[in-house]
A protein has these predicted regions:
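Hydrophobic residues within beta-strands of alpha/beta enzymes
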Residues: 100, 249-251
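Boundary at the C-terminal end of the N-terminal hydrophobic targeting segment
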Residues: 22-28
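Positively charged n-region of N-terminal signal peptides that target proteins for export
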Residues: 1-4, 304
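Loop/helix patches that line or flank the sugar-binding groove of alpha-linked glycan CAZymes
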Residues: 54, 58-59, 262-284, 292-302, ...
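Acidic/aromatic-lined carbohydrate-recognition and catalytic surfaces
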Residues: 29-239, 243, 256-316, 327, ...
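Core domains of carbohydrate- and sulfate-ester-processing enzymes
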Residues: 164-209, 343-360, 431-469
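Bacterial N-terminal signal peptides
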Residues: 8-21
Length: 472
């Protein structure tokens, strides 16, 4: 049924008169699941977890990623918010969306646009309040839509109370909640590890004259997951949100939770990256086996709450990906598969190869073709001439393969990547550091285009990022 219906969907996408964009996802869902049954009286559709065939709800679901800054602005301050998302639930329901993944909406200094969390159990005022969040979950449930939160597990903000205490003294209560080390010698960091966002992964703190480790920005110090107190505190965060009605978490950068305690230097590869740093193999600070111990325990908490765990594993190696399912599928239900992101053109041979590899995986696939860190599929797969047709073909393929798709907002209407034309317009720190070779991620984070009114219906004032001139 799945493969046969894929052809029907693809043909429909190639004939625009046959199918409107508002039914794109809903129609494609039919290829991989039975016709949905109406919920029993008094029972919200989102409460059902297993179907008659024993499939979990997330195996039939279409997930939809929302970057809250850019989705819908309810109070006209130029930044999207939770009330904006709530106002668009009818639209999401009509699309056939079963769950929305909301990127971080917690209090944050916004150095990395929310991926530097200063309080895991609240909502950043720019997005609203806990009351607004509760309203969103309540209204979403009425529409049969589940809420998935982005959980930044690897690090906190340097403004989090844990880190502020940790850096205050070598004997502080939270000192060992982060990774502190002496330098190799005065003025030199403990090893050669580099930050993903440029420069050394070690920053010297003048107060205690020790270095702290950060895989990402200096304002994002890594948590020490070898400390049981850290694990307990972070597990409690998930329980807090489960009680508020969420159905699971997307675990950010889950592969970087552990580092080699002996701090061996990483192997250095030839050349420089786009930020001008040596290219290194993250042998000693990524994908260490200890992460699987944490995932097994976190899965138990998820199972107790009927929750789903999606993992950002950043691997295109099927053998490595399989490890994140765990033995007997006791770790992540949905480790994110980035194989399609390695294909940058519509090549049947390349896609056939990747699909065959995905089908060899030990668990249920979770495909990624676009998100807030990746150039939109419209541009990546397009040839500059037939982009509209290619986008429709990709949608048909993506939504009818065995597995769970995650649609990035705006993909359903063919939104394009629009990077800034000038360095002074760049908001993403990566783009400011790496310009012009690396222009950052602003281009794939522009406001959702709702209609043909001013600012494409996103806001009545100038948005935090400009609406592309190609919007229509």
């Amino acid at each position: 049924m799945q493969r046969k219906f894929a052809w029907i969907v693809v043909l429909a996408f190639l004939c625009p008169a046959f199918m409107g964009r508002s039914t794109l996802i809903a129609a494609a869902q039919m290829a991989d699941k039975p016709t949905p049954r109406k919920a029993a009286a008094g029972k919200a559709p989102a409460s059902k977890t297993v179907d008659a065939e024993g499939h979990q709800w997330w195996q039939h679901a279409v997930f939809y990623e929302i970057y809250p800054r850019s989705f819908a602005d309810s109070n006209n301050d130029g930044i999207g918010d939770l009330k904006g998302i709530t106002s668009k639930l009818d639209y999401l329901k009509d699309l056939g969306v079963d769950a929305i993944w909301i990127t971080p909406c917690f209090p944050s200094p916004q150095v990395d646009f929310g991926y530097d969390v200063s309080d895991y159990e609240n909502i950043d005022p720019m997005y609203g309040s806990l009351t607004d969040f509760d309203m969103l979950t309540s209204e979403a449930k009425k529409n049969g839509i589940r809420i998935i939160l982005d959980f930044v597990v690897n690090h906190t903000s340097d403004q989090h109370k844990w880190f502020l205490d940790s850096k205050s003294s070598r004997t502080s209560e939270h000192r060992d909640w982060y990774i502190w080390r002496d330098g190799k010698e005065p003025g030199k960091p403990p090893n050669n590890w580099t930050s993903l966002f440029g420069g050394s992964a070690w920053t010297l703190d003048a107060t205690t004259n020790q270095y702290y480790y950060h895989f990402f920005y200096p304002q994002q110090p890594d948590l020490n997951w070898r400390n049981a107190a850290v694990k307990d505190a972070m597990f409690d965060v998930t329980r807090f949100w489960y009680k508020r009605g969420v159905s699971g978490f997307r675990l950010d950068a889950v592969d970087t939770l552990f580092e080699d305690p002996n701090l061996h230097d990483n192997p250095v590869l030839p050349g420089k990256n786009a930020l001008g740093d040596p290219i290194e193999e993250n042998k000693y600070n990524s994908k260490l086996p200890e992460v699987h111990d944490v995932l097994r325990e976190l899965r138990k908490v998820a199972d107790e709450n009927n929750g789903v765990l999606i993992g950002e594993t950043w691997t295109t190696d099927i053998a490595e990906l399989n490890k994140y399912y765990g033995e007997g599928n006791n770790e992540l239900q949905l480790p994110m598969d980035f194989l399609f992101t390695t294909v940058n053109k519509l090549s049947p041979a390349d896609f056939r190869k990747q699909i065959a590899a995905i089908d060899s995986a030990s668990g249920w696939p979770t495909f990624v073709i676009s998100n807030h860190d990746i150039v939109r599929s419209y541009d990546r797969y397009g040839d500059g001439v037939h982009n509209d047709q290619i986008a429709k073909l990709m949608a048909g393929l993506y939504l009818t393969l065995r597995g769970t798709p995650i649609i990035y907002y705006g993909e359903e209407i063919g939104m394009k990547t629009t990077p800034p034309a000038r360095k002074e317009d760049v908001k993403d720190p990566i783009g400011r550091i790496g310009w012009p070779k690396e222009k950052g991620r602003d281009g794939e984070r522009t406001p959702m285009q709702w209609d043909e009114s001013e600012n494409a219906g996103f806001s009545k004032v100038a948005p935090w990022l400009p609406v592309p001139p190609t919007a229509k």
